[in-house]
């Protein structure tokens, strides 16, 4: 059982090490602790902390550094989010001050803002697709039996794909099919549109075209593109600043993790309906990829009411200043949520 003084010493070692990157010795602790404690007493307490595996000695110094076990204990029992100074608050608020034209623009830019604020790698995911509605659909003839299918959503995204129309489908049939979509699907959530596309829409289209399969495939393909969750990454190169790896192929593998959407989703362990109202921290030894053993991943959800939830993540060194980063993430998600809620309100007003 650790004493209150030992817990204070552990907390101080982590604070000093994450601020300076230098091992912490008893003399430094003696000058930093809020009460007077002799150097000998501090050394005894540090020995006890080392015996239970919460701190460890480095080869190059007589000081001590936190162990993975020490970081986990600190994160689970001791940490308190830092109170940010007014300059930090103003910087975050001003970063979201500009005008944005669509949801993806806000979410992608937020990753860049957060990476610039922290010098780490930031990852953002927009609000869940369940809340996004279909607001427009059209086909633009390009000639030679080709058309461009265009879908517009309430998130402000415009997705398009070029398709070759089967010879069996006439221009008149296409116009009627578009009318069916506009009459029955516009204004509905994309998840509902996808369901109706399989159940109700085929029967409606059969009234106007003999074989609606070609049109349904076109609409389904561009709908899937519009429904894809989009992960945005800011500060990719920051990840390499804290790597202890020297092998070029391993460094490339780390870089690829955050540039491949499947690998990134796996790293974030995205699960439908799972929400973190508090900042969660996974240390390197708690992640499945050994290349990230010297990194930590911080994640937290942000809430935009009826429009669902999104996610913010920060990937940095295990020795990052957790207290400050948690305080910053809490503020950042509040400001991002406000910006998105304002966007949705403006969008809804423009549609009414």
From Swiss-Prot:
Signal sequence residues: none
MF term (GO), any: DNA binding
Gene3D superfamilies to which the protein is assigned, alphabetical: 3.30.450.40, Heat-inducible transcription repressor hrca homolog, domain 3, Winged helix-like DNA-binding domain superfamily/Winged helix DNA-binding domain
GO biological process: negative regulation of DNA-templated transcription
Recorded superkingdom: Bacteria
Keywords in alphabetical order: Repressor, Stress response, Transcription, Transcription regulation
Family membership: Belongs to the HrcA family.
Biological function: Negative regulator of class I heat shock genes (grpE-dnaK-dnaJ and groELS operons). Prevents heat-shock induction of these operons.
Record protein name field: Heat-inducible transcription repressor HrcA
Organism (species): Latilactobacillus sakei subsp. sakei (strain 23K)
Encoding gene per record: hrcA
């Amino acid at each position: 059982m650790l004493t209150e003084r030992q817990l204070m010493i552990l907390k101080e070692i982590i604070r000093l090490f994450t601020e300076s990157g230098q091992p912490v010795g008893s003399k430094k602790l003696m000058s930093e602790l809020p009460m007077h404690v002799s150097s000998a007493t501090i050394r005894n307490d540090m020995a006890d902390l080392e015996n239970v595996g919460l701190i460890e000695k480095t080869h190059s110094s007589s000081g001590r550094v936190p162990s993975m076990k020490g970081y986990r204990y600190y994160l689970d029992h001791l940490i308190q989010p830092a109170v940010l100074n007014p300059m930090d608050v103003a910087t975050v608020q001003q970063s979201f001050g500009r005008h944005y034209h669509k949801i993806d623009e806000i979410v992608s830019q937020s990753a860049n803002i957060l990476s610039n604020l922290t010098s780490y790698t930031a990852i953002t995911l927009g609000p869940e697709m369940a809340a996004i509605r279909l607001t427009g659909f059209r086909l633009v003839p390009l000639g030679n039996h080709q058309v461009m299918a265009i879908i517009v959503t309430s998130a402000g995204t415009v997705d398009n794909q070029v398709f070759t129309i089967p010879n069996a489908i006439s221009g008149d049939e296409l116009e009627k099919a578009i009318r069916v979509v506009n009459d029955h699907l516009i204004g509905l959530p994309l998840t509902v549109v996808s369901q109706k596309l399989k159940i109700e829409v085929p029967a409606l289209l059969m009234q106007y075209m003999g074989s609606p399969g070609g049109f349904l495939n076109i609409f389904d393909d561009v709908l899937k593109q519009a429904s894809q969750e989009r992960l945005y990454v800011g500060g990719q190169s920051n990840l390499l600043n804290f790597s202890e790896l020297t092998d070029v192929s391993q460094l490339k593998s780390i870089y690829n993790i955050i540039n491949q959407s499947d690998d990134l989703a796996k790293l974030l362990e995205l699960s439908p309906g799972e929400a973190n109202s508090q900042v969660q921290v996974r240390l390197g030894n708690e992640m499945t990829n050994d290349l990230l053993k010297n990194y930590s991943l911080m994640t937290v959800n942000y809430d935009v009411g009826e429009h669902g939830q999104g996610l913010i993540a920060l990937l940095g060194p295990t020795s990052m200043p957790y207290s400050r980063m948690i305080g910053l993430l809490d503020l950042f998600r509040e400001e991002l949520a406000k910006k998105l809620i304002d966007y949705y309100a403006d969008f809804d007003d423009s549609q009414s």
